[in-house]
């Protein structure tokens, strides 16, 4: 019988620490598992944040209950990015996770979702293009940069420095691209955030307009990231409560 491995997970509860469980096999970082939690061993969803490892422990380690989604909705690079944010802001990783990820997101992504978050952006050669005179003609520029065809299901992320700006851009593009365009900022409801997260993961949403928090969405086929007023200080997070 193969020896069990240990994995570290973040549970779907607003707790500021990670937990360790046993798993019968190695799991991909970002996989969703169900684990027994607390004295009552209530089964809740969790996301793996480490590869399987072996380590002697002087305390009881529970086994995971089941593997809900081995493909997961977070790539290992996303988890690595979350860890970097945790170290940079000196905030616990679970707190980073829960401040960035919509509530109950682990509960709405089932094993039927078979798309892999390949982090396409990092595997391609992208060039930075600075638009110096980005005036009232921004809509004309955006329409020029956004291109769709039947063969490619490209996604576009348009970032604005503030919520008001994201609304203005969204309403302008919504008139043109209809259901292909979605808005993501702190003013939309948790239910809407869950819907957008899942649609982006499935590549159903092609254009996302939002503030800086939108960069954490699970894009699969992102083609371009367009940053409006990239010099704006609001892109720099100065508050330890991430938004």
Task: State the predicted function of each range.
Residues 1-243:
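Accessory, non-ATPase domains that flank or precede helicase/AAA+ motor cores in DNA-metabolism machines
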């Amino acid at each position: 019988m193969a020896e069990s491995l240990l994995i570290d997970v973040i549970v779907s509860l607003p707790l500021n620490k990670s937990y360790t469980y046993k798993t019968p096999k190695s799991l991909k970082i970002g996989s969703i598992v169900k684990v027994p939690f607390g004295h009552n061993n209530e089964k809740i969803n969790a996301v793996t944040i480490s590869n399987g490892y072996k380590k002697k422990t002087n305390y009881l380690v529970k086994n995971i209950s089941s593997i809900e989604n081995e493909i997961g909705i977070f790539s290992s690079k996303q988890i690595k990015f979350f860890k970097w944010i945790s170290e940079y802001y000196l905030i616990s990783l679970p707190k980073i996770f829960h401040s960035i990820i919509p509530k109950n997101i682990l509960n709405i992504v089932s094993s039927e979702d078979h798309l892999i978050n390949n982090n396409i952006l990092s595997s391609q050669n992208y060039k930075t293009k600075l638009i110096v005179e980005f005036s009232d003609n921004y809509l004309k520029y955006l329409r020029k940069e956004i291109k769709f065809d039947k063969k490619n299901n490209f996604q576009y992320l348009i970032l604005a420095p503030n919520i008001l700006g994201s609304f203005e851009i969204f309403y302008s593009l919504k008139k043109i691209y209809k259901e292909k365009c979605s808005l993501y900022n702190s003013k939309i409801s948790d239910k809407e955030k869950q819907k957008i997260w899942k649609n982006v993961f499935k590549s159903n949403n092609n254009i996302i307009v939002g503030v800086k928090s939108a960069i954490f969405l699970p894009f699969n086929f992102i083609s371009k990231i367009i940053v409006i007023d990239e010099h704006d200080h609001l892109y720099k997070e100065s508050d330890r409560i991430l938004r």
